[in-house]
Amino acid sequence: MNTVKTLQDLRAAVARARSEGKRIALTPTMGNLHSGHAALVTKAAQRADFVVATIFVNPLQFGPNEDLATYPRTLAADQEKLLQAGCNLLFTPSVEEMYPHGMADQTLVSVPHLSQGLCGASRPGHFEGVATVVSKLFNMVQPDLAIFGEKDFQQLAVIRAMVRDLNMPIQIIGEPTVRADDGLALSSRNGYLSDDQRAAAPALYQAILQTADVISAGEQDFDALLASKKQQLEAAGFRIDYLEIRDATSLRPATADNREVVILAAAFLGKTRLIDNLHLTRS
């Protein structure tokens, strides 16, 4: 696995692979990798001949009071994980390499509606930052396919819409969330949890599963169901950002008529914000 830091070196390496007729996959990350990221790279290696991973902690997608400065940087460990997972090329640009003209006047990519509400409501500007950096990486690498985790369900929906609306010839693949044995979705931010918070954290996914079971049993009063689950989570020590049942494609609030729905949650344990979701096909 080669590691490059400049756009020039990235494009040269990708051009060599493409000249050899290789199918190219991209897996963008912010580093501090766990086995969920490794699963994305492994899947990319199964679907393509040349896997490019990126590690870039993107300032544009962090709010003023978020964890940009403290987000863990673990490059050596990340390189080892990527190598074992089947990555061929790692791109680790600096902020100056990604935004050579500064960020104040950077052209931004905005995906309306899908970026609003849910995480977009509590993290204004976040998805604009995500869409902008992902579109830049897509232009830099020009992959045949790109793989993202379904844990960030709203992010995946935003990227799918961006690719569709901007006619990018890239196949977007969502991979199922990788979980710890107790059900907690793997996240780079789980390391912020204290021991007590880590023990409590699986209750978020348990509440989502219970919500899905009740919906599958025929419950149609979503508001009452969500209210009871919010109370349950608050009693377990969570501070709720949102708990919603949405149409799985449009992310608009689900009704009794929606067959494909997604249950989405974001909640704080202490200062750590956890997100999770579950896609459900109603009979």
UniProtKB/Swiss-Prot annotation:
Subunit details: Homodimer.
Entry's Gene Ontology BP terms: pantothenate biosynthetic process
NCBIfam families linked to this entry: panC
Note: The reaction proceeds by a bi uni uni bi ping pong mechanism.
Source species of the chain: Pseudomonas syringae pv. syringae (strain B728a)
Domain of life of the native organism: Bacteria
Gene name per UniProt: panC
InterPro entries: Pantoate_ligase, Pantoate_ligase_C, Rossmann-like_a/b/a_fold
Active-site positions on this chain: 37
One GO MF term attached to the UniProt entry: pantoate-beta-alanine ligase activity
GO cellular component: cytosol
Residues that hold beta-alanine according to the record: 61
EC number in record: 6.3.2.1
Function: Catalyzes the condensation of pantoate with beta-alanine in an ATP-dependent reaction via a pantoyl-adenylate intermediate.
Catalysed conversion reaction: (R)-pantoate + beta-alanine + ATP = (R)-pantothenate + AMP + diphosphate + H(+)
Pathway(s) annotated for this protein in UniProt: Cofactor biosynthesis; (R)-pantothenate biosynthesis; (R)-pantothenate from (R)-pantoate and beta-alanine: step 1/1
Localization in the cell: Cytoplasm
Binding site for ATP: 30-37, 149-152, 178, 186-189
Lineage: Bacteria, Pseudomonadati, Pseudomonadota, Gammaproteobacteria, Pseudomonadales
Name the UniProt record assigns to this protein: Pantothenate synthetase
Homology family: Belongs to the pantothenate synthetase family.
Keyword annotations: ATP-binding, Cytoplasm, Ligase, Nucleotide-binding, Pantothenate biosynthesis
Sequence positions that bind (R)-pantoate: 61, 155
Main location: cytoplasm
